[in-house]
Amino acid sequence: MCYSTKKWVVRQIRKPKTTVILLVIAIGLIMITLSHGNDIIQGIGISLLSSGLVSAVSTFFSISEDSKKTVNDWGLEHVYMTRGEMNSSCDEYLSRSKNLKAIGFGFRSLRDSQEGRIISMLRKGGNVKLITMKPDCPALKLREEDERQKISDSISELLEWAKELNGMNLPGKIEVRWHEHLPSDFVFILDNRLFNGPYEYGKLSQQTISFEYNITGTAYEYHEAYFDQLWNDKSYCANALE
């Protein structure tokens, strides 16, 4: 048997469907020999049963290793059913971070519950970069319909909040840029953690599934590069605090 044929046979044997078929045939043959006493058929049945079990175990560990590699490569740490569940971990890493980059809308939870941490970040010379939407752009109306609440007011409050904190003349500063395109995901990038999740139809932002990634994975690198690309693209977003 040539090498390529052997590889094909191995791939077929390792398929879950093939494994199940082998196990069923093996059990059937063993049951027949138990009732008729045919040692040859019994030997074949036991051989197939052994092959099926080995294939099942091999497939299980192969899938486990592949999954583990994917998780490690992307740096996935946690999956949260809601953004609200994610907030406690996000708050913890925010308190240790010197800088913040984020894409969203009004960042109400950041302003309401984390203002002290943001001020502390600014006192240490850290910077906050936020990308949001223009309050009066037509695309924002679509998201307001999805969430069934007034987002434009929250964005206007965000701008006033940023101006107020910048007025404290701390070493760091808050920068806000806006655009006219609906973001598909919330993105929150800290010094050593990435948090993100989708904006879903008919759900408030705090009620959608969210993900946490460490700094060593591809996801962190990908999202930070994407943020920087948007931030530096003057045709995409402009200074919202001028």
Task: Show where each model-derived region lies.
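Juxtamembrane "helix-exit" motif on the non-cytosolic side of transmembrane helices
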Residues: 30-38
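Juxtamembrane interface helix immediately N-terminal to a transmembrane segment
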Residues: 1-25
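Short acidic-hydrophobic, aromatic-tinged amphipathic segments that line or gate anion-handling sites
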Residues: 76-83, 176-180, 215
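HKD-type phospholipase D/PLD-like phosphodiesterase module
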Residues: 140-185
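PLD-like (HKD) phosphodiesterase/transphosphatidyltransferase domain
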Residues: 60-142, 224, 228-237
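HKD (HxKxxxxD) catalytic microenvironment of the phospholipase D
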Residues: 174-211
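Signature of lipid phosphatidyltransferase scaffolds
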Residues: 196, 200-242
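Transmembrane alpha-helices and immediately adjacent membrane-cytoplasm interface residues
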Residues: 39-70
